[in-house]
Amino acid sequence: MHADLGVQPDTVRRSELPGGVRLVTESVPGVRSVALGIWIGIGSVDETGEQAGAAHFLEHLLFKGTRRRTAAGIAEEMDAVGGELNAFTAKEHTCYYAHVLDTDVALAVDLLIDVVTDAELAHTDVELERGVVLEEISMRDDDPEDLLGDLFDQTLFGDHPLGRPVIGTEESIRSMSRETLHSFWRGEYTTPRMVVAAAGNLEHDRIVDLVGDALAAATRGRGEARSMPPRAPTGVRPVRAGALGLQPDESEQAHIMLGVATEGRYVHARPVLAVLNAALGGGLSSRLFQQVREQRGLAYQVYSSTVRYADAGSLAVYAGCAPERLGEVVAVVRDVLGEVAVDGLTDAEVARAKGSLRGGLVLGCEDTASRMNRLGRAELDHGRQRSVTDSLARIAAVTPAEVAAVATELLSRPLTAAVVGPYEALDELPVSLRDL
């Protein structure tokens, strides 16, 4: 693992364009595609109560047409070259992206910038997409695991914006006006908040020219504006340790997430927490998978995950099981977390976790879309790029003692839990959940 298996120092280039748009590219020889994304440093945490779900609503709406293109025209242009066009919204950012052949990168640049900067937002389209978003909320409500994720965030982060679902609520979407959406778009989708990331068979200077030409017609955010720095923590600690949330659901399984809040992404060294997470529940050999599924057969699916935002994050365990076995699952998970908090992980567990992270990182570099995502997130979150070689070295440097220290710090905290399943009230849940 000593060779540079990913980003070479001279293949990632960065430019800042007039208006404050940041452009980061990575040349990947030997491929015939380019993945290109326009990242906006705006997500659901930036919404007011009235705007809840606006960032995600806009993600749908911007594809409905611009002054130069109809919705059908947008789809036809991309289909005609066999490309992919899509978008996603998260708590702290939104990304509009395309994946095309290298010969069609000019089309991808023009189309994406047109969609992001010159959308129509017609009243009829707002009403049409309102119904689509409401259907998406219904789909979320019919998927216990998706519903659980939102419930856990709400239970852990409470009234902080991190606790709100990205998709919004049925009430907020039904009441959201075209004026609210237009104001959010005009006020937040400014060029200093934009990052253009591209990876594949490309030339940086050509992408600079294409993006600059496409942005020349934009009517806002030009001039001497400078790019915005990475999102800073607000100083608010959005934590409700020991809370328990329940969403009754007539499902055959009980679905549970339990975990703890972590500090924001600028506090803990990311590789240490990532190693801890991988060893706890990141794979088939992980401590939780072995204890819950392999040795006791209590659940088909069990894993841990970690997310990091500017203000805070979480380290959480998910499991789905028969309702009558929920108490036993919770007891085993709590025992595992308690053991790791006190005794740490074995050297072998740490070594396997580090190997898993190394392999996942390098394998992800074989995909131009993954590389583009890495570029965009790094620029938005940190304002800099870190080579894969550097990332591999940081993973390799993690020691069992460092992992043990973070495990003791985090896993000694009171657990927060959320449950989706066939229970009507909190007092129907197992005692092992009610004494967190």
Task: Give the positions of each predicted feature.
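N- or domain-start disorder-to-order transition segments that initiate the globular core
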Residues: 1-33
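A conserved active-site cap/scaffold subdomain adjacent to cofactor or substrate pockets
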Residues: 265, 272-282, 288
